[in-house]
Amino acid sequence: MKMTSRPAGACARLPVALGLAVAASLAHAAPADEARTLDTMVVTAAAPSSPLHWVTDPRLPRQPVPASDGADYLKTVPGFSAIRNGGTNGDPVLRGMFGSRLNILSNDGNLIGACPSRMDNPLSYIAPESFDRLTIIKGPQSVRWGAGASAGTVRFERDTPRFDEPGLRADASALVGSRNRNDQVLDLTLGNPTGYVRASGNRSEADDYKDGHGDVVPSKWRKWNGDVAIGWTPDADTLLEISAGAGDAIARYAGRGMDGAAFERTSYAARFEKRNLPGAWDTLQANVYYNEADHVMDNYTLRTPNPNSMMPMPMPMASNVDRRTQGGRVSSEWHWQDVQLVAGVDGEDSRHRGRMGMGRDTYRQAAWETDAKFRRYGVFTELTLGAGTDQRWISGLRIDRASVRDERQSIRGMMGNRPNPTAGQRRKEWLGSGFLRYEQDLADGLTWYAGLGHSERMPDYWELFSPNHGPAGAVNAFTGVQPERTTQLDVGLQYKGPRVQAWVSAYAGQIQDYILFTYHGSGMMGMSQARNVDARIAGAEAGLEVSLAGQWKLGGTLAYAWGGNRDQQRPLPQMPPLEARLSANWEGQRWSAGALLRAVTHQHRVAEGQGNVVAQDLGPSAGFATFALNAAYRFSSQLQLSAGVDNLFDRAYSEHLNLAGSADFGFPADPERINEPGRSLWMKVNYRY
């Protein structure tokens, strides 16, 4: 498959200009002991901060250099992988689990994508570098952050700025790289002891990349986001904040029949927090949010309609879908010596609608049609016994009432529209979740834990409304697909010493009524069916970092996931293969240098024709290994320049979790996985004031 693209540009003036600007501002910076500093030079892998919890700074440079969305950031945490669409907007997978099994929150709000095939998954609307912290909880080991998080929870968080005197804080970065990669991020906060104004913005763009064979892979993108927050802090324990944000993007997808011509985001939120309340009552928190995703897919903005494709794709066409989600949460914390209690309520309401048109931009004149409405309310509590001691029991319980209404009056098919047999029907379900975990500190720096968790998940929009068919005997997926129930055991060991840090975690679970997609045929004529099966999952992750003499560090991580379909006695689809990362880093007072080897084995445990709403197993995949180098220079504790080369030897390879390339771009009719980028150069400057 051959394509042409415009030559790569240098784009080198941007980091130089930013570097000169921020260097000039150093003359007016705060004293060194008050400065906000940059710590790690380049992140190649993340380690847990506590049992099953990962916390990392998304603004630090990462290798391989991530795309503009959140999926590539998550891949530095062992156990995460992603399904590639093109150059950006990959769909995250944790331990082989996909979709709403992974609860993704931005500033404690839920922004759900609108595309029936998840071309705009939730991470498509999140700009990671505009957040202060990325927190990950693996497994069903928390009930605080919503229902159904059987695989885990991902939170992109912003801190509350506090000022002792009037001042200004800033975070800025610029990135340039191969295929005209060009990113800028600016986050400014102006405040005093009684309040603040915070404004953040980012833009990101890149052209189509070339794989290791030199072939162009359709993958270009352009993105921007902007957010502003105004906070009132009358004292050190009180916060009232209102915020608003917007964004948009375009993205070319090698593995889709259409591209993303619009990713419009509109967000509003408010939050209140009061700490150090009298007596045992310590904290009260509340937040409300409104998020809307307005997404346009077409086959003419970023490509030319393919005259050889099946109807109706030879002619220009577009689909406009919209998802509005609004919700809120109230929680309180109580402390009694070594006992901590958290209790609260939360809920959300979501509406999905769409319109489409044949011909360029004719969809704009079409009327909106609502097809689904979701609603959920829940109560939760978490209890910690032995908080602050060397033996801790942590438990949680959650109960949710979920409902969904089918608003479709008719269902589109290859032979035209037909009446919907479930029009106006509503499904209601009670969902229960809970966990119990024991943690013990055995010696200095050594901790082990074991936890048992259970999660019940309501089928999401993509599982109820996207499939062409439901289980055998059901009129459609809306009536036939049942809630998914996961029971999982997590165990692990962590050690943090002066020179050695090591950790290992393992899990085994049983999933009743796992929601499985089966595909019959391919292309526009292909049909999908959603059904429930019983499944088993298991796996492990491990990491090691050793500090040697001479400021050297050696590290490595390992991740493995396994799944089995008990009903059909075959592998569970979309399971990533065994992956290892080995790193060597040298870090001096100002300079650092590092190397990263990533090795992935073949995957022969496949279930061809089965998967999820986005992807299916395309057959066995080959193993591969890539090598990357990085270097960084710290001008001061606040200013840093880093650079690197990914896929140094220009290897041609593809990931197991993948889409088949679209025939519109010259990919063969037989499914062929999309190759990863070839050799890529990048340079990034970070400034923090």
Predicted feature descriptions by range:
Residues M3, L385-W393, R401-A402, Q501-A502, ...:
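Gram-negative outer-membrane beta-barrel transporters
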Residues A170, G257-D282, N320-T325, A372-F374, ...:
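Outer-membrane beta-barrel signature, preferentially recognizing the C-terminal barrel domain
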Residues R158, A174-S178, N192-T194, R203-D207, ...:
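Transmembrane beta-strands of outer-membrane beta-barrel pores
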Residues H213, L341-L446, M458, H469-P471:
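Signature of Gram-negative outer-membrane beta-barrel scaffolds
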Residues Q510-Q512, A599-E608, A632-Y689:
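C-terminal beta-signal and adjacent terminal beta-strands/loops
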Residues A206, G212-H213, S219, D237-L284, ...:
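Flexible loop and strand-edge segments within Gram-negative outer membrane beta-barrel domains
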Residues E34-E165, N180, V491, E672:
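Acidic, small-polar-rich N-terminal luminal/periplasmic segments of exported/outer-membrane proteins
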Residues P116, S142, R155-E157, F163-E165, ...:
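Periplasmic-side early beta-strands and strand-to-turn transitions of outer-membrane beta-barrels
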